[in-house]
Amino acid sequence: MSAKVWLVGAGPGDPELLTLKAVRALHAADVVLIDDLVNPRVLEHCPDARVITVGKRGGCRSTPQDFIHRLMLAMRAKANAWCDLRAATPCIFGRGGEEALWLRERGVEVELVNGITAGLAGATNCDIPLTLRGVSRGVTLVTAHTQDDSSLNWRALAEGGTTLVVYMGVAKLEEIRQQLLEGAMAADTPVAMIENASLPQQRECRSTLAHMHTDAQVFALKSPAILVIGSVAGAGQAASITVSASA
């Protein structure tokens, strides 16, 4: 019988944010493929499984995706059940959708298991509500790192009026700043830059759109980091949020 595959989100880093469904999948797995950004402590839930590291880290040397695909197919004949364990959640900038499609086209049974995304975990740890009545009625999740290195339409995002949560944006802070300002986003819009979201070494740099690039340099912001851009990013700072009846 063919192996069952779980594509599992390991959460943003804090092992206590692992879901119960993810824990059950790890308990059942014979083999676990683990991403570079996954906290090794989650492997306590699969002590007898064979663990294979398949590093995927933006801006660094990574395991090629086609190699991961071939490895997945090879595991089909060698394991009864296995997990591909990814940081955060596999279906938000985690290749979970394309991996599930690739496996299903080859007759492999696949189950996707969501995790808590880093944008939500990091914001929550900094007491930032991504939506807030009278302030922000929506959230837009975007990645600044694309496969073809094309740029997002930041000007359109500036006009959207939602909280922006930007993944993989550290290397493009100046481009993001310029494009949002050109899209008429206010220069004093609050920005929170959150490094190592949910981990004990989490760091937080509060700034504004106009100054976020220079402040990040002084702060020595490093990846992995999340950017939260919008009025809600002023949460926790006295008199920093203005509530509007129309929001």
UniProtKB/Swiss-Prot annotation:
UniProt-listed SUPFAM superfamilies: Tetrapyrrole methylase
Spans through the membrane: none
Gene Ontology process terms (BP): cobalamin biosynthetic process; methylation; siroheme biosynthetic process
Pfam entry (one): TP_methylase
Record-annotated disulphide pairs: none
EC id: 2.1.1.107
UniProt keyword annotation of S-adenosyl-L-methionine present: yes
CDD domains linked to this entry: SUMT (cd11642)
Binding site for S-adenosyl-L-homocysteine: P12, T117, A118, M168, A197, A225
Pathway: Cofactor biosynthesis; adenosylcobalamin biosynthesis; precorrin-2 from uroporphyrinogen III: step 1/1; Porphyrin-containing compound metabolism; siroheme biosynthesis; precorrin-2 from uroporphyrinogen III: step 1/1
Keywords, sorted A to Z: Cobalamin biosynthesis, Methyltransferase, Porphyrin biosynthesis, S-adenosyl-L-methionine, Transferase
Keyword Methyltransferase: yes
Catalytic activity: uroporphyrinogen III + 2 S-adenosyl-L-methionine = precorrin-2 + 2 S-adenosyl-L-homocysteine + H(+)
Signal peptide feature range: none
Any one GO molecular function term: uroporphyrin-III C-methyltransferase activity
Tree of life domain: Bacteria
Family of the protein in this entry: Belongs to the precorrin methyltransferase family.
Described purpose of this protein according to its UniProt entry: It is a step in the biosynthesis of both cobalamin (vitamin B12) and siroheme.
Name of this chain's protein: Uroporphyrinogen-III C-methyltransferase
Species name: Pseudomonas fluorescens
Organism phylogeny: Bacteria, Pseudomonadati, Pseudomonadota, Gammaproteobacteria, Pseudomonadales
